[in-house]
Every structure is written in C-alpha cells, then in structure tokens.
Design a protein with these regions (language model features):
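Rossmann-like NAD(P) dinucleotide-binding subdomain of oxidoreductase/dehydrogenase enzymes
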Residues: 122-265, 395
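Short, well-ordered beta-strand elements within core beta-sheets of diverse protein domains
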Residues: 32-38, 53-59, 145, 255-258, ...
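ALDH superfamily catalytic-core signature
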Residues: 221, 229-375, 438
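Hydrophobic face of amphipathic alpha-helices that form TPR/SEL1-like repeat modules
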Residues: 1-27
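Glycine-rich loop-to-alpha-helix module at the N-terminal edge of alpha/beta enzyme cores
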Residues: 32-120, 130
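Residue-level signal for inorganic ion chemistry
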Residues: 29, 65, 87, 110, ...
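Structural signal for hydrophobic packing residues in well-ordered secondary-structure cores
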Residues: 54, 58, 73-80, 84, ...
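Conserved C-terminal structural/oligomerization subdomain of aldehyde/semialdehyde dehydrogenase
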Residues: 28-34, 219, 256, 310, ...
Length: 480
C-alpha cells in the first residue's frame, strides 16, 4: 500500500502529525492507499518553500515559465493511460471518461495557459497629452489553490496553470478523497526538473489543512472549487485579511427543451449531460424543462436512453456509468432518492442502489434516476444533489421556462434546445447563469470566462479572467 506524502520544496515529506487518512476505491469500497493528514505546520512549511521560490519564479521571463508548464504537460501526456487508471480508481468514473476527458484536459490546461501567457498584456501603456501611463500586472506572491474530488486532475491543473504562468508560487490542496493524480503530478514535477518550491502540494482534510491554507496571512489569494457551504466559510474566514477570492461553487442547472429542437442531437446530449461522471459534475443538467407538445415523447425516449447505459466496473472499457466517489456521498444520494419519493415524485427509472457482481460487489453504485411530478420549490428541485438524479417538468411557454429556470438560488449553467436563434437569444439573456449552452453541452473555449451567478460563485476562471485574478495591476504615471 502506497502512502501519499506532501510535496514541499521539491521533495516528498511525511505530514507533521505522522497521521494518514484511508483512501478508498469507490468501485469496491475497499482501502487501497493512505494519504497525509496534514495540519497548519505543513501549510507553514509549504508557504515558506513557496515564498523562498517566489523571487526566482517571478523574475524569469514568461517564455521560460511557459517552457516549464509545457514540460509538465508533456510528462502527463506521456503517461496518459497510467494517469487515467489512477483517476478511474480514485473516483469511480469510467476509465473511458478519464482517458477521453479528464487527463487530456489536464494536459490542455498547462498547454493553453503556457501559450496564452505569451500573448497576455502584463505591461501596456495609456498615453495622453497630459501624461504617460505605464500599466503593469504583477504576480501576487504565494497563492492557494483548493480543488474538489469529482474532476481531480482536471480542476487541480485548471487553477495551478494560470497561477504559475502569471509568476505566482503555489500551495495547492487536492481533495483527500481523490488525491492520487495530484500525487503523481508531484512526481512529474520532480522528474521534469520543475524549480523547487514553485509548486507545493499539501494533502489532508478541509477542516485542518484546508482551513490553515485559507487563514494563512501570507497567502495572497484563494482559488476554490467546491460546495457553496464551504465557499461561504472561506469568505467569512478571509474577510479580515482581504484576500482575493475566486469561488466556483454549486449548481442546480436547468435544461430547457423546446419542440422545435434538433430532437436526436438533443436526446443523445441530454443523457450525457445528465449522467456523465454519475452526475457528479457541477455543470450537469439536473432540472429538465420540456415543452408540453414533446414532453411525453421525450420522457419515453429519455428513460429508454438512460436504461441502456452500461453500469459496472469503472476499470472496464465498455462501462459508461460507474460508482459514486465516496461512501458519504453515496449515502447522501440515496437519501435524496427517498426525499424525492416522500415529496410525491414518480420514479420513472432508477431510484435504488445497485449490487455489481464480482470485485465491485461492495462498491458504491446507484441507478441513474429520473423523477417527474415534483413541484419546482421542493427540496429535490432546489438543493444541489450532485449525483445521478434528474427531474422532469412540462412547460407551456418561454415565460414559464425562464421563471422555472431562475427559481433557484444557484446560477452556474443552463442549456437551451431550439432551432430558433432569436428565441435562444431571448431566453439566454434572461436566464441567470454564468454559462449558457445552446444546442450543445460542455463545449469549452478556454479563453472564455467561466463561473457562476448567485450562490454558484464569485469571480471567473479561464483566459484573461484567470490571469487578471492572479495578478495585481499597478499604474505608473509620468507627466510630459
């Protein structure tokens, strides 16, 4: 059994407490590793390492930093299948998904920001008859990056890459539930000759090491992806220190389907957008609003499509639907299935746990579940479940679609299905969500801003927005 240690100053270091947490394989429910249970002393050591490396890292050119990021990308890509196996084992997601999405996206994150940093305006000028103004965007210093368990390497690198290309040094904390690919990223950094101290990876629980990172006075910014409740705690804990915050949090995303849509494309995409990664993506559709003329047809076809998903061992190439990522989350999802039934919901398909024969017999599997007949104000339609449970509602008009879509405290994403471009534009402009997909889902141009409205987030990631977040502007004004 491998013990996952912290990565500080280019070396693997056991936690100050000498305590470790069990790491489980969701597909079997069995322990396969353990990970450092770090505390504030480990965070302090990582901070000191990052602080010592900051002068060097911020002092080299963007081109040099880009070269280092590309080396990391090359290292991950050269071991893509290996990383995919680790990600699948850690999370319970199908290995085909890890191979086609998670690990390639991690590679893309480093390569994108390596290239994007070369064109970003870290220096510019604004001149007039009265003055010359030199505008400089400088790195903040040591920053903290906290990533979730559902897309471990995908979102870990999404935060680290822009922080690094901007010239910051980083103390990063992955989820203790799914730490393995972050650990392997440490190996890539070491083997690629990445400058010591520039990236430090600390493992452990949110209430201990995560809290210490958030509260550390030397950390200039926190980039966080996770639940809204945790995001609120981070906001409170950092209020007095005025840290910069980027918070990407929960969602309860509507999909609005009109009768004039490209039906076949919509149907195939809705199965994927509802149940990809077992519904454990913040952008998954969870409230499906269908125009009345096609509601019954869609219901029948959607249930059929979901019923055909291949559920099973995530390590098998043919599996389309794997295990939930932790026992606690498995129990939470099962509890919401019961809540939906108690609220009067009619289960069209699913609604139960699953026993998989063979090595996965004790794994954390539930059925993909579709429910209709619920009021929009009920808990099932208002609270983020973050699992394979979706609800169906019939709509009569654009007005009703917009009203129901916005009737939630979240505002992360939405999808709209119609061949009428004017209708799509009308509705998009009135739905409160940070990203809206029209006739598609999860299509991402990494130059565009990403983040949510309302309780779904604060700040934006991606492209210019990410590099603005990880830099501080300064104006140097000289008179003629």
């Amino acid at each position: 059994m491998i013990s996952i240690n912290n990565f500080i100053n280019g070396e693997f270091v056991p936690p100050n407490s000498n305590q470790y947490l069990d790491v489980y394989e969701p597909a079997t429910g069995l322990i396969y590793s353990n990970v450092a249970d770090s505390n504030s002393n480990d965070i302090e050591n990582a901070y000191q390492s990052a602080q010592s490396a900051f002068k060097f890292w911020s002092g080299i050119s963007v081109e040099e930093r880009a070269g280092y990021l590309n080396k990391i990308a090359d290292g991950i890509e050269s071991r893509l299948d290996e990383f995919a196996e680790y990600e699948s084992r850690d999370t319970g997601k199908p290995i085909s998904l890890a191979k086609s999405v998670d690990i390639p996206r991690a590679v893309s994150n480093f390569r994108f920001f390596a290239e994007f940093g070369l064109s970003f305006q870290f220096e510019s000028e604004l001149n007039s008859d009265q003055s010359q103004n030199k505008l400089i965007r400088s790195p903040l210093g040591v920053v903290g990056c906290i990533s979730p368990w559902n897309l471990p390497l995908y979102l870990f690198t999404w935060k680290i890459a822009p922080a690094l290309i901007a010239g910051n040094t980083v103390v990063a904390k992955p989820s203790e539930i799914t730490p393995y690919t972050a650990f392997k990223l440490s190996e890539i950094c070491r083997d690629a000759g990445f400058p010591v101290g520039v990236l430090n990876i600390i493992h452990g629980q949110g209430r201990t090491s995560g809290n210490a990172l958030v509260c550390h006075r030397g950390i200039k910014a926190i980039s966080f992806t996770g639940g809204t409740a945790t995001g609120k705690l981070i906001t409170k804990k950092t209020a007095s220190s005025f840290k910069k915050l980027s918070l990407e949090m929960g969602g309860k995303n509507p999909a609005v389907i009109f009768a004039d849509c490209d039906y076949d494309n919509m149907l195939e995409t809705m199965v994927r957008s509802s149940f990809s990664n077992q519904g454990q993506i913040c952008l998954c559709s969870s409230r499906i609003l269908v125009e009345e003329p096609i509601y019954e047809k869609f219901k029948i076809d959607f249930v059929q499509g979901v019923s055909e998903l291949k559920i099973g061992d995530p390590s098998k190439e043919g599996t389309q639907f794997g295990a939930l990522s932790s026992k606690g989350h498995y129990e939470k999802v099962l509890s919401y299935m019961e809540i939906a039934k108690q609220e009067g919901g009619k289960v069209l398909v699913g609604g139960n746990q699953i026993k998989i024969n063979g090595r996965c017999e004790t794994g954390w599997f539930v059925e993909p579940t579709i429910i209709e007949g619920l009021n929009n104000s009920c808990r099932t339609n208002q609270e983020e479940i973050f699992g394979p449970i979706v609800t169906l509602q019939s709509i009569q008009s654009e007005y009703e679609a917009i009203q129901l879509a916005n009737e939630t405290e979240y505002g992360l994403s939405a999808t709209i299905w119609t061949e009428d471009k004017e209708k799509a534009n009308r509705i998009s402009s009135q739905i409160d969500a940070g990203i809206i997909w029209v006739n598609c889902w999860l299509v991402r141009d990494l130059r565009t801003p990403f983040g949510g409205m309302k309780q779904s987030g604060m700040g934006r990631e991606g492209g210019d927005e990410a590099l603005r977040f990880f830099t501080e502007p300064k104006n140097i004004c000289t008179t003629q």
